[in-house]
């Protein structure tokens, strides 16, 4: 049982045994996950010489409150994850002529390089840089990297005969079962979920293992870049059952969303824009901060400047970025701003901080196992400690994929060992 059709939920499904039936539910349509909204890119360890720098950048951004083991696992796993994404048809920008690498060519080249002893299959790819990164290490697809990755994963999952996706189905509780009292929270383990479909029918779905990958908490905020239906349902249910939670106060505010008086989800202006040279300006057109500091630092600087200026926003100028880069790297941002009346190639745009990401969540170990047996969590729903108190830009997709795969691998290992949930004395 998987709850959520974002990157974590889909990648978990792809890594579970094909001889097991897998049911995925999602609160809205399958495409309405925050993973689809991710703009900037996905980090990767370019080569071994970048390890220390990447590790330090992640730790520093997280105020050194990160779980070091988790950071190491994520970084060490990144190259394998990227290889798998390319194999699934994900296209990342290449150096030559801004052309993206298609899957067959990438796979063929990767195999050839490996057979010849070359370890770095990433040499032909273009990398961008974002705030708090000491060097470029972010792969990207225009300014819709999340959509590119997640749509390809969703297509792969939909092709699997052993997986069924139920849309417009909301988890309302988990099923817990008593054991011999030796494992889990007070001898209880997860045995499935309770859900409600679009017609209001209550569904009791039994499963030996459950993965919670239902996203973050942005729907609880008035101003957020998240979809409004992401309201932390899994956290509420976990708390009800005494499942361990961690760092619920670790909420990231993104420095730059397009200012608007309209209600609803805020449109993100990717950090990659600042990585490529955009600068922040006060009401007088004066630059007031280093745009490539960690997100919480830049957010604080913007809020302080807004207070000084007595304004509801500051300005972002892309004048230092050439027009071709804007049109090729940031076409979605360019088009959206045009729709809102701003031509970013000719004028500044108003930006304001908004809630963006949840670093806390349901506590999990390095295999994404929660404190309740047979219950796993991955993606923004979970807290494995990678991000510490503040997430480094473009680590979210990578973290979701790495630890979703580890959850699937752990479940497969337990199934191979004969582990099935005992459905005794069920409660909900």
Task: Cite the ranges covered by each PLM segment.
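An anion/pyrophosphate-binding glycine-rich loop and adjacent beta-alpha core
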Residues: 30, 237, 243-349, 410, ...
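Conserved redox-cofactor binding core of oxidoreductases
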Residues: 86-201, 213, 257-260, 280
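N-terminal Rossmann-like FAD-binding beta1-loop-alpha1 element of flavoenzymes
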Residues: 1-24
């Amino acid at each position: 049982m998987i709850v959520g059709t974002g990157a974590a939920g889909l990648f978990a499904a792809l890594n579970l045994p094909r001889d097991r039936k897998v049911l995925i539910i999602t609160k809205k349509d399958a495409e309405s996950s925050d993973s689809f909204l991710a703009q900037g890119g996905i980090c990767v360890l370019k080569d071994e010489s970048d390890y220390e720098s990447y590790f330090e950048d992640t730790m520093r951004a997280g105020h050194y409150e990160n779980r070091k083991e988790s950071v190491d696992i994520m970084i060490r796993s990144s190259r394998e994850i990227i290889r798998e994404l390319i194999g699934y048809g994900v296209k990342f920008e290449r150096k030559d002529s801004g052309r993206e690498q298609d899957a067959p060519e990438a796979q063929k080249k990767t195999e050839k390089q490996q057979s010849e002893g070359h370890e770095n299959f990433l040499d032909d790819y273009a990398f961008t840089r974002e705030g708090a990164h000491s060097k470029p290490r972010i792969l990207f697809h225009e300014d819709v990297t999340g959509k590119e990755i997640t749509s390809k994963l969703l297509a792969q999952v939909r092709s699997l005969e052993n997986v069924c996706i139920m849309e417009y189905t909301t988890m309302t509780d988990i099923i817990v079962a008593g054991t011999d009292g030796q494992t889990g929270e007070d001898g209880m383990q997860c045995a499935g979920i309770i859900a409600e479909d679009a017609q209001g029918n209550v569904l009791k779905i039994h499963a030996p293992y459950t993965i919670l990958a239902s996203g973050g908490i942005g729907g609880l905020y008035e101003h957020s870049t998240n979809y409004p239906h992401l309201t932390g349902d899994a956290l509420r249910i976990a708390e009800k059952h005494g499942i361990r939670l961690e760092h619920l106060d670790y909420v990231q505010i993104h420095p730059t969303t397009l200012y608007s008086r309209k209600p609803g989800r805020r449109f993100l202006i990717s950090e990659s824009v600042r990585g490529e040279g955009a600068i922040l300006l006060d009401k007088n057109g004066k630059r007031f901060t280093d745009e490539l500091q960690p997100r919480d630092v830049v957010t604080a600087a913007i809020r302080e400047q807004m207070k000084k200026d007595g304004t509801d926003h500051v300005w972002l100028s892309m004048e230092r970025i050439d027009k071709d880069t804007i049109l090729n790297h940031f076409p979605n941002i360019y088009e959206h701003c045009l729709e809102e009346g701003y031509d970013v190639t000719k004028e500044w745009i108003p930006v304001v901080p908004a809630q963006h990401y949840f670093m806390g969540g349901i506590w999990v170990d390095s295999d994404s196992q929660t404190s309740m047996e047979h219950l796993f969590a991955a993606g923004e729903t979970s807290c494995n400690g990678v991000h510490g108190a503040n997430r480094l830009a473009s680590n979210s997709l990578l973290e979701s994929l790495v630890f979703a795969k580890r959850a699937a691998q752990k479940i497969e290992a337990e199934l191979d060992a004969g582990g099935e949930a005992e459905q005794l004395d069920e409660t909900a």
